[in-house]
Amino acid sequence: MRKITFLGLILSLSIVVIACNGGWESLFNGENLDGWKVHGTEKWYVEDGLLICESGPDEAYGYLSTEKNYDDFELSVEFLQEADGNSGVFFRSTFDGTKVSGWQVEVAPPNHDTGGIYESYGRGWLVQIPDEKENILKMGEWNEMRIRVVGGHVTTWLNGEQMVDIEDEKIAEGKGAIALQIHDGGGIRVKWRNIKIKEL
């Protein structure tokens, strides 16, 4: 009985914390990869409270996905690109090894559509960002990305500026996890922090 009461107390406190944060819940605790799953041989580790993704010796694709699936949500992340900086944030995605089925919000070097939406192993680019928005990305500095997914409606923002807005029937049917990507080719290092989600 005591164990059940204690677990109930922990659950109640968790609900209170989420409510006090306006419904936002942290996905990264700043200490370890609890709640996440590594796909592939690329490097994912925590350093000075930051989540680091870095190319490994295989120079292959790598992913770090949430153990939990998310349907409708608003996600906020901050990232700092070093070296090539080619990465991405996937949503409603499933994995077979390092083959991912789902949708990616691009995180890439300048002039490569950061904030656009790409469908992996499917239709490719669904929407790229306008050329005049390429200067919103701050290479080598911290950037804030926000992603809102409701049904088949997806909106992305970078540093407070809306990047794309799309309605897609196939996305509406998708189910799966949120994930961060390391692109293949080597030379990639990206830092992440303040990864939080609000389920809608």
Question: Across the structure, where does each feature detected by a protein language model lie?
Answer:
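Bacterial N-terminal signal peptides
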Residues: 8-16
